[in-house]
Amino acid sequence: MSERHLFTSESVSEGHPDKIADQISDAILDAMLAQDPQARVAVETSVTTGLVLVFGEVSTKAYVDIQKVVRDTIKSIGYVDGQYGFDGDNCAVLVSLDEQSPDIAQGVDDSLETRSGDADPLDQIGAGDQGMMFGYAINETPELMPLPIALSHRLMRKIAALRKDGTIKWLRPDAKAQVTVEYDEDNQPKRIDTVVLSTQHDPDVDLDTIRQTVIDQVIKAVLPADLLDDQTKYLVNPTGRFVIGGPQGDAGLTGRKVIVDTYGGFAHHGGGAFSGKDATKVDRSASYAARYIAKNVVAAGLADQVEVQLAYAIGVAEPVSIAVDTAGTGKVSDEALINAIRENFDLRPAGIIKMLDLQRPIYRQTAAYGHFGRTDIDLPWEHTDKVDALKAVFK
């Protein structure tokens, strides 16, 4: 048994500069996939005061009005007022998109297996890059996610909803939340120790109003009352003022919130970001597949928690390795789990794309509030439709 300990995770709102960039990149990806499901897309975005830069590599038959997609995305987030130092109607938008490198394309279009004479059509697509990707699930929340990141996302979704429906009129789009959970000797969540929430606001609202409103209408409205006690600390706008925010306050860049996007630091991360990438990029698709595996393993009762690692070589279809770690909670051996995974999940890029139906415009909705454990949207890698097949292996 371990001693009681604290664990902290954070989330950020859709108006955070890095998340604006993620959403623009994924909105462009979606617009291309809507016209051309085979599009190869790797789009990065940078945002700063009054300026958006879109750059990367694309191979597609689609025609997309990038300027319109960028401006519509910014306005939908809530940047519609020039007083914010950044708004969708008046910012400059610069675009520099090249074609995908033919050196990369030849390995993705025709994998090593295909070039070696393998006739299986699902061997056709080689991995778009080398790397390792992780998926994780744990049974401490209904969505099988770690509690600290799940609660942090809930806070951010709530404050965005209150801003967008006009309930709290002085809110502006940029915000961050951080939740510290105390775990007991058996590694079970015991209580919430600290909540940090910083939100951008209009200049004419006082700090006491901000703090009391956020505690009452956001924090206590969202967090489980049985985990809050008189020792829980609430730190709301602890700098005292947060008027300048969004891209005016900090430059933003696609792919800088990879821990917010995943498990809040509870599990390993391979380093690759998701947004702006089509599903031939295993940074994205294999991370989704690894979560799909992990969630089904835990939902099947085969472990209380599991971390799955997949690794790929560029231009090769089959993963070079599969590893699992149940942290001692497995009801079967890790080796047996790996065999069951190989039997029930096709982890070649084309197999993942087919299994999870990934050549669709479904990505913009993932670019804020996390890619995993989402209860507000339907994502194929969150389905638990492999539970019966996994259980059958161990009957």
UniProtKB/Swiss-Prot annotation:
Binding residue positions for Mg(2+): 18
Enzyme class, broadest EC rank: transferase
UniProt-annotated stretches for the region Flexible loop: 100-110
Complex formation: Homotetramer; dimer of dimers.
Pathway linked to the protein: Amino-acid biosynthesis; S-adenosyl-L-methionine biosynthesis; S-adenosyl-L-methionine from L-methionine: step 1/1
Role played: Catalyzes the formation of S-adenosylmethionine (AdoMet) from methionine and ATP. The overall synthetic reaction is composed of two sequential steps, AdoMet formation and the subsequent tripolyphosphate hydrolysis which occurs prior to release of AdoMet from the enzyme.
Signal peptide: none
Family: Belongs to the AdoMet synthase family.
Protein name (database record): S-adenosylmethionine synthase
Molecular functions (GO terms): ATP binding; magnesium ion binding; methionine adenosyltransferase activity
Residues reported to bind L-methionine: 57, 100, 250, 281
Presence of the UniProt keyword Magnesium in the record: yes
Cofactor, how bound (note): Binds 2 divalent ions per subunit. Binds 1 potassium ion per subunit.
Subcellular localization(s) per the UniProt record: Cytoplasm
Domain of life of the organism encoding this protein: Bacteria
Pfam families from the UniProt entry: S-AdoMet_synt_C, S-AdoMet_synt_M, S-AdoMet_synt_N
Binding site for K(+): 44
Any one GO BP annotation for this protein: S-adenosylmethionine biosynthetic process
Catalysed reactions listed for this entry: L-methionine + ATP + H2O = S-adenosyl-L-methionine + phosphate + diphosphate
GO cellular component terms, semicolon-separated: cytoplasm
Cofactor(s) needed for function: Mg(2+); K(+)
